[in-house]
Amino acid sequence: MYKRQSTKTAYYHLPGLFEFYDLYSVFLPLFYSHREYFYDWCDIASVYGAPADCIWGGGRVESGNRDPRKVLALLREYGISARLTFSNSQLEPVHLADKKCNALCALFSENDRVQNGVIIHSDLLLDYLKSHYPNLYFVSSTTKVLTDFADFLNEVKNDDFLYVVPDFRLNKAFDRLNTCLLYTSPSPRDRSVS
C-alpha cells in the first residue's frame, strides 16, 4: 500500500476542462490509482476552462465541446473542483441572460462533495453569479492584469474571492506575496459543502 511521505502539498490547477477531457479521462484514474508514480507532495485542486462559444468566456480561446455532465462526473469521481473560466471583460447586462452560460452555472452549482467555482473578470458578472448561483466560489482572473501591488492586495482582501490569480509580473515579488498568504484559503476539496 502506498504511504504519503510529505506533510505539505502543492495543489495544481490544470487547464482544459472541456478541451482535454479525453486526456483527463485516462490521466486521472492513473494519477489516483497509482500514486507511487507521482510525487507524494502534489495533488490536483481544480481543472478550469469553458466550452467553445461561451459569451461569458473571453480570457482564453477554448475549443472543447464535451458534454458538461460527463466532464463534471469525471471530476466528481476524483473529488476535484471544476472551475468555469468566464473572464470576458466586455460583458454588458444583456449578456447575463445567456442560456448556455446560465445552464452551465446551474449544473456546476449542484455540488455533492466538492464545491465548484468560476474564474471571473467582470464585476457585473460577479454580482449576477453571487445572487443567482450562491453555491459557486469565485476566483479573480489574471486577465484583470493587476500589476500595482496595492490593487492586488485589495483584490486579495475582497471576501468575494476564494482565490486571486496574480499577474505574472508579480510572480517574483516574494517578499510582498508572502504577506498575502495570510489571506489564502484551503483547497476547495478541503472545504465542507453544506
Task: Tell what function each PLM region has.
Residues 24-39, 65-76, 177-182:
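Short amphipathic alpha-helices and their capping/turn segments at secondary-structure boundaries
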Residues 16-23, 45-132, 137-147:
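Active-site beta->alpha loop and helix N-cap motifs at the rims of alpha/beta catalytic domains
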Residues 38-41, 110-112, 157-158:
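Alpha-helix termination/capping residues and helix-transition junctions
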Residues 25-30, 128-132, 151-155, 175-179:
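A short acidic, amphipathic alpha-helical/loop segment
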Residues 114, 132-138, 156-164, 181-182:
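Glycine-enriched alpha-helix->loop->beta-strand junction motifs that scaffold or abut catalytic
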Residues 1-3, 183-193:
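Single conserved hydrophobic/aromatic residue that forms the stacking wall/gate
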